[in-house]
Amino acid sequence: MGKVLIIDDEKQLLRLLSRMIGLEGYTVYEAESCKAGLKLLALRRPEVVLCDVRLPDGSGVEFVKDIKKLYPCTEVVLLTAYGNISDGVLAIKNGAFDYITKGDDNPKIIPLIAKAMDSAVRLYNEKNCQLTDEGKHYTFEGIVGNSPAIQDAISLAKKVSQTDVPVL
């Protein structure tokens, strides 16, 4: 059906939303901060992000700009416990698909995820979205090998990766 990333620092609500959305057939990923969310965005490439407005390491309203810059076809729905109209307006201006109040009893969440998913799929098809150069994150995790030669190669690659020098 599609992939949804939920970013919320309230663990209980995060698990509840994850279960609820997962039961609808979506693959769900969880993060508790903007930083962890960005890592999962790069690794899993979800079509929809459901993000809390207030996170320990940043504002969800501002985080929308970062997400849309790196992943323009990913739709972002912001969750808030505070129905602040000015935050909602700013979120939409920053590129959010929608802005909704938190609560496990909010019957609008699942239909809203479905709408956001449809929109994201449409955007991916229309724009043939690709990652921007800024969105490409490469790591050295997962490289198998502990020999001194491999460790030297990884060390050198890490040093060179911080520069703009072409490497063959």
What is the meaning of each model-derived region?
Residues 8, 52, 80:
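Active-site residues of response regulator receiver
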Residues 11-29:
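Two-component/phosphorelay signaling modules centered on CheY-like receiver
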Residues 14, 56, 84:
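The feature encodes the CheY-like receiver
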Residues 32-36, 59-62:
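Acidic catalytic/metal-coordinating carboxylates
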Residues 39, 54, 61-72, 90:
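Short amphipathic alpha-helix used as the core "switch/output" element in two-component signaling
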Residues 44-50, 55, 77:
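Active-site beta3 strand of CheY-like receiver
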Residues 132-168:
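AAA+ ATPase active-site-proximal loops
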